[in-house]
């Protein structure tokens, strides 16, 4: 990768995957989805086919169609489109990486395999390297999500020396809660001009203090405009406003968790707040009762109306 890469910063929406009532991907929603993120949330970068998007429950072909639709409708509108290509099979990940390059994605990301797990950081780096080699001109971001993968490796150990093996490596989507490990990632990335994006939405303020460059999350699909205010307040040194916004955000998430806040609930909340038909989740996730999502949406409305 020879050309200079535009650094990935700010808010990145981890997109949901719209499905029809029959459980098929619904590409007709994507164009309006792009406009909603930009016009209503002021969020101009996306992370497609990740956890929020139920990527690991989709077929390779479905993931290709979704990525292509986001590229098609986001062209000239979105600042950056990162495609998650992680799979249990390295061959599938490589195929998705090549496809992402062919459609003009701005970068790719890969999560650790979680059935046959890498036994150490060297093994995981090798996996990332072989996926990246299928799209060597695309920036590569490691997706660290130990809570879902069960891979108990520290991200800082994975990053150590990775630039010597993967010239296109550009950073990490850190979706763990270990702030010490996160801080080490930020420290290591500083001299390399990489991006460290935080992925635990309700703890963003702590990550900002450590120096992360932005955040990737599901709630930025419908609370991005509020979190953008928080980022502005933080960057302007208004720590009281930043903290108050974070506390309000935490209150919403805490309320949602009392009702059970998994991907299926979050997806229905997105439908309620945005008006876009996200549809049901894919099994084994079960549909969310509308009343539960409406209660969370009302909590979000109350929070945002006071700002």
UniProtKB/Swiss-Prot annotation:
Record family assignment: Belongs to the DapA family. NanA subfamily.
Protein location: Cytoplasm
Protein name per UniProt: N-acetylneuraminate lyase
One cellular-component annotation, GO: cytoplasm
Subunit structure of this chain's protein: Homotetramer.
One MF annotation (Gene Ontology) recorded for this entry: N-acetylneuraminate lyase activity
Presence of keyword ATP-binding: no
InterPro entries: Aldolase_TIM (IPR013785), DapA-like (IPR002220), Schiff_base-form_aldolases_CS (IPR020624)
Primary gene name: npl
EC number assigned by the record: 4.1.3.3
Known catalytic reactions: aceneuramate = aldehydo-N-acetyl-D-mannosamine + pyruvate
SUPFAM superfamilies, sorted: Aldolase
Lineage start: Eukaryota, Metazoa, Chordata, Craniata, Vertebrata
Keyword Lyase in record: yes
Organism in which the protein naturally occurs: Danio rerio
Pathway: Amino-sugar metabolism; N-acetylneuraminate degradation
PANTHER family (alphabetical): DIHYDRODIPICOLINATE SYNTHASE, N-ACETYLNEURAMINATE LYASE
Superkingdom of this protein's organism: Eukaryota
General function of this protein: Catalyzes the cleavage of N-acetylneuraminic acid (sialic acid) to form pyruvate and N-acetylmannosamine via a Schiff base intermediate. It prevents sialic acids from being recycled and returning to the cell surface. Involved in the N-glycolylneuraminic acid (Neu5Gc) degradation pathway.
GO biological process: N-acetylneuraminate catabolic process
Catalytic site: 143, 173
PROSITE patterns: DHDPS_1
